[in-house]
Amino acid sequence: MEKQDRIKYLVDILNKYAYHYYTLDDPLIADSEYDVLYDELVNLEKETGIVLPNSPTNRIGGEVLSGFEKHEHLNTLYSLGKAQSKEEVRNWVDKTIEFVQNYNENHVNKLPKVEFYVEFKFDGLTVNLTYDGGYLVMATTRGNGTIGEVITSQVKTINSIPLKIKDTRLMEIQGEGVMPLSSLENYNKTHEPKLKNARNAAAGALRNLDPAVTRERNLDAYFYNVNYLQDNELETQEEMIKFLGDNYFKLYPYEKHATSFEEVSKFIDEIFELRNEIDVLTDGVVIKVNDFKTREKLGYTNKFPRWAIAYKFEPERFTTIVKEVEWNVGRTGKVTPTALLEPVEIGNVTVKRATLNNIDDIERKQVRLNSEVFVRRSNDVIPEIMGVVNPDQEDTEEIEIPHYCPYCHSELFRDGVHIFCPNSMSCTPQLVKRMVHFASRNAMNIDGLSEKTLEVLLEKLNIKSIEEIYDVKKEQLMQLDGFKEKKSQNLINAIEKSKNVDLANFIFALGIPEIGEKTSFELAQKYKSFDNLREAKFEELIQIEDIGNVIAEEIVEFFHDETISNSIDSLLSKGIKIKNPENIEKKLDNLTFVLTGSLVNYSRKELTDKLSNLGAKVSSSVSKNTDYVVYGEKAGSKLTKAKDLGVKLMTEDELNSFLDNL
């Protein structure tokens, strides 16, 4: 259970951190801390073979805010794989060189000797600029890699960004919007509240709906990539950089070429020494293969290009004192410690908290109350405690491990390095988080039933179980602060609408340990009805792809737990009608679809899942291998490209007719 439990924890916490970092521009932890957790998840997934559907390893990036107009990029904006040590850089360099050598041994048309391009990695906000006819026509954020948010007005306040360039072809140019450290210092002399760091200042300015705010922060931008170019003739990174310079894009005056790890390592050290002398926040180095044909042969993972890697510098360490430890309860009942620190200034940020993973983390690092500890961070909020300064420090006290839940006072139990509250039915934090999961879009999809709303319902209406959601009356809601006629009716309508639910969504909503969306779908397809699933046998379950012994045991135990079974029966008595799945044949095998524009009857994810379940591949970019492009309103350049290539086009209605006739 311990490894599976750890995977689930890592997926949940990394998704939370990614949401705050990419979507809210309100990072909760340092990049280095995120990378450590991410690498741990990758290793555990490889070791166990368990990859949850919502794992960040499946993702390219973060979610898109609804406050800005959306825009589809002409090509996917990939993030970069990260190396945490020089040894990892060496391995990447060696693998790349070996790949080219093996390729050349087996092909007549040889690839050139591998040359690496080494450059600064700046810490700001990625901007993607679209030029057509020589003019800037669109500027967007990276968004989730496929769809960004339009920030054209904000970007135009940056004087270093050209509004007109020489080349008249359609193109996308990628760069980094940054706030120079001198601009940050000058801004803080005359403004309150003061900005905490340059990265958040740049991101916040570019994501502000008022361009006047952006202009006031005196941003800059550096460019490093041509993401798309019509009739692209560029063959190397070196040619690309020259093309950017010739078209008035600002380049950072540092570029080095290397043919070996030793040379790459030398340039990494050089940039590390220069980083505190420059006027821009930098947190590492980017290393790319120079030749584009070699890049094409190396290709991509679903998240990163194999031809580039980012090396992040080890953050500086500081010391502070652990004053207290608080214990918080999650959806699964896990009780997690958080260290409250004596405030310490790190990189213009006042740090007061640090997450401690578990009891083992406390014991292994010998952390005690009043201990002087090493903490480290890059440019984000919550640091990592590395260990104590002096294990023999005398004026410290042992951190008391709680025996009773800090919320419901139930007796806790220990499982491995974690402690849990067993009171899953009425422990408020657990109940709230389970209800949030139950109401989430890919579960029962109760629009408007947020965590904040649920906390109010539990407190004011004395709701004690999930099924009581369906007993809430409009009159009760209208008595609560913030609930008027329309909001109350909308929530009641959403609750009522959720009673008609697909079997896969209902299975996912129950929150069975280790069961994500993909496994819920597979269970629905296998058992066809909820009654059949409740009677599932261990021997049957382990025959299903992606379900091993541990997950099979979890499912059997879940449905044989008397309390859970009674709760499910009570839930079903509220009028829940479960739609059983039809037999799905893979009728779209070997067909590739691309979606573009705003859809009416589906979210992009819903339609992607629908097509994927029928065997289709849904791609993020149009090519000659695309079979169909499905387009909605405000379809962008992908539609134009599809027309140019002669790809078959479908409206949403035409797609529905097409699927109905399969």
From Swiss-Prot:
It holds the Pfam family DNA_ligase_OB. It catalyses: NAD(+) + (deoxyribonucleotide)n-3'-hydroxyl + 5'-phospho-(deoxyribonucleotide)m = (deoxyribonucleotide)n+m + AMP + beta-nicotinamide D-nucleotide. Its cofactor is Mg(2+); Mn(2+). The keyword RNA-binding does not apply. One of its GO terms (molecular function) is DNA ligase (NAD+) activity. NAD(+) binds at D31, S32, E33, Y34, D35, S79, L80, E119, R142, E176, K288, K312. Its EC number is 6.5.1.2. Keywords: DNA damage, DNA repair, DNA replication, Ligase, Magnesium, Manganese, Metal-binding, NAD, Zinc. SUPFAM superfamilies: BRCT domain, DNA ligase/mRNA capping enzyme, catalytic domain, Nucleic acid-binding proteins, RuvA domain 2-like. It comes from the Bacteria. One of its GO terms (biological process) is DNA replication. Zn(2+) binds at C405, C408, C421, C427. InterPro entries: BRCT_dom (IPR001357), BRCT_dom_sf (IPR036420), DisA/LigA_HHH (IPR041663), DNA_ligase (IPR001679), DNA_ligase_CS (IPR033136), DNAligase_adenylation (IPR013839), DNAligase_N (IPR013840), Hlx-hairpin-Hlx_DNA-bd_motif (IPR003583). One of its GO terms (cellular component) is cytosol. Belongs to the NAD-dependent DNA ligase family. LigA subfamily. DNA ligase that catalyzes the formation of phosphodiester linkages between 5'-phosphoryl and 3'-hydroxyl groups in double-stranded DNA using NAD as a coenzyme and as the energy source for the reaction. It is essential for DNA replication and repair of damaged DNA. PANTHER family: CHROMOSOME TRANSMISSION FIDELITY FACTOR 18, DNA LIGASE. This is DNA ligase. It comes from Finegoldia magna (strain ATCC 29328 / DSM 20472 / WAL 2508). The gene is ligA.
